[in-house]
């Protein structure tokens, strides 16, 4: 009698291990996840002028980025939303999106990225400098110099200059 119960026990164990648990089950079951459309992430920051990029990241074109501050508290609610969201503009970095001028953010971190710079104005450079306020002085100075160098190299490659 022990032999037929062993495969039956194994089959039951397999069925239970691939179940959809209450905590992580999307609406409509496991197969419905591909059908859900991306929505815009929750607003955050002063005057709700930013968007959540992760549980502790709030960015906006006018604001720059807040990392782990009081302005990002609302972004923790995003983990409890039933559908996925997407914030930001064009893709950048390995898995990020442009969050503010010159800043690329993923769900975990933000970094300066030349892909996210608005084309060539001094106001764009000033806005990128303003976004560095979350960094300490030495790191901010180094990143600022690297961004200026990258911008000069990019302008030097344009024909007719």
Curated annotation (Swiss-Prot):
Residues in the signal sequence: 1-19
InterPro entries in the cross-refs: Neurhyp_horm, Neurhyp_horm_dom_sf, Neurohypophysial_hormone_CS
Localisation per UniProt entry: Secreted
Pfam families listed in its UniProt record: Hormone_4, Hormone_5
UniProt PTM comment: Seven disulfide bonds are present in neurophysin.
Matches recorded under SMART domains: NH
Cysteine disulfide links: 20-25, 41-85, 44-58, 52-75, 59-65, 92-104, 98-116, 105-110
UniProt keyword terms in alphabetical order: Amidation, Cleavage on pair of basic residues, Disulfide bond, Hormone, Secreted, Signal
PROSITE patterns assigned: NEUROHYPOPHYS_HORM (PS00264)
Function: Vasotocin is an antidiuretic hormone.
Family per record: Belongs to the vasopressin/oxytocin family.
Name assigned to this protein: Vasotocin-neurophysin VT
Organism: Gallus gallus
Lineage per the UniProt record: Eukaryota, Metazoa, Chordata, Craniata, Vertebrata
